[in-house]
């Protein structure tokens, strides 16, 4: 089935959707997500940048674990612990920079367990000039009530967003949701959170227990961080691995 082309961009959530997804933003000089009072999930980092030369290099000193990079609402790419810099395809002038960071998990062994900070921390530079005056906002994606989200038609494919769709079944049974082709995010069925997906791992399906399914129409909400614009989700009778 294909989720309807109705999306709710994160930047519009406070106005369009449940306020439970965001907490108050804060101006910070440090960048760990624990400063926001959260230990897991997503955080949005925002700053105004001045570009003096086209295609500047954005670099971060430390990141755990992953962040999507947007400039003026357009996806530029991703930064990770293994790839800490990215060339921005932008013109000269003033632009709005957004970094959507996620804590994928926690280390449970080894020396790094003593300092397992998450988010972006240390210096963040544009062409070796440190970016200041950051605003951080916790995004309580997994804790939100997706049944309260208000969707509006949107044709552009830019910022991270929620998709919604429906499928129909005759008899509820244990099945799997195939997220092949999607980038990174979370899924709910009938308002119940069922799990996350990431294109970088071999698992392509999320188990769906019969207990949360209904005979007839069932509702699906997908949060997509990387916005691969896939828009197609399939049901499967078995787990799928690459």
Name every feature range the model reports, one short phrase each.
Residues 85-96, 163, 168-170, 205-217:
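Short, surface-exposed tryptophan/glycine-enriched loops
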Residues 72, 190, 207-209:
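Helix N-cap / beta->alpha transition motif
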Residues 127-170:
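Compositionally biased low-complexity segments at domain edges in trafficked proteins
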Residues 55-70, 97, 167-190, 197-198, ...:
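Aromatic-lined ligand-binding clefts that engage carbohydrates, nucleic acids, or primary amines
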Residues 206-242:
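Terminal leader/tail segments of proteins
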Residues 77-84, 195-203:
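A short acidic/small-residue loop/turn micro-motif
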Residues 39-48, 157-168, 204-206:
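Short beta-strands within extracellular/lumenal beta-sheet-rich domains
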Residues 1-133, 144-149, 225-227:
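Carbohydrate-binding surfaces of carbohydrate-active enzymes
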């Amino acid at each position: 089935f294909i989720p309807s082309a109705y999306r709710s961009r994160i930047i519009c959530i406070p106005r369009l959707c449940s306020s439970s997804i965001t907490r108050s933003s804060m101006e910070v000089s440090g960048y760990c997500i624990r400063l926001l009072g959260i230990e897991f999930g997503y955080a949005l980092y925002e700053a105004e940048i001045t570009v003096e030369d086209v295609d500047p290099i954005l670099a971060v000193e430390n990141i755990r674990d992953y962040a999507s990079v947007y400039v003026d609402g357009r996806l530029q790419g991703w930064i990770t612990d293994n790839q800490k810099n990215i060339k921005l395809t932008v013109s000269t002038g003033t632009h709005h920079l957004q970094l959507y960071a996620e804590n994928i998990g926690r280390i449970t062994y080894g020396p790094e367990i003593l300092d397992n900070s998450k988010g972006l921390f240390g210096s963040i530079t544009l062409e070796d000039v440190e970016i200041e005056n950051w605003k951080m906002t916790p995004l309580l994606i997994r804790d939100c009530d997706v049944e309260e989200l208000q969707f509006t038609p949107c044709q552009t494919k830019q910022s991270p967003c929620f998709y919604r769709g429906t499928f129909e079944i005759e008899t509820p049974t244990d099945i799997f949701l195939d997220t092949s082709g999607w980038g990174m995010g979370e899924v709910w069925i009938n308002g119940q959170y069922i799990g996350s997906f990431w294109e970088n791992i071999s698992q392509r399906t999320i188990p769906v227990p019969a207990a949360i399914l209904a005979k007839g129409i069932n509702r699906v909400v997908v949060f997509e961080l990387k916005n691969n614009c896939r828009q197609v989700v399939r049901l499967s009778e078995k787990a799928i691995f690459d």
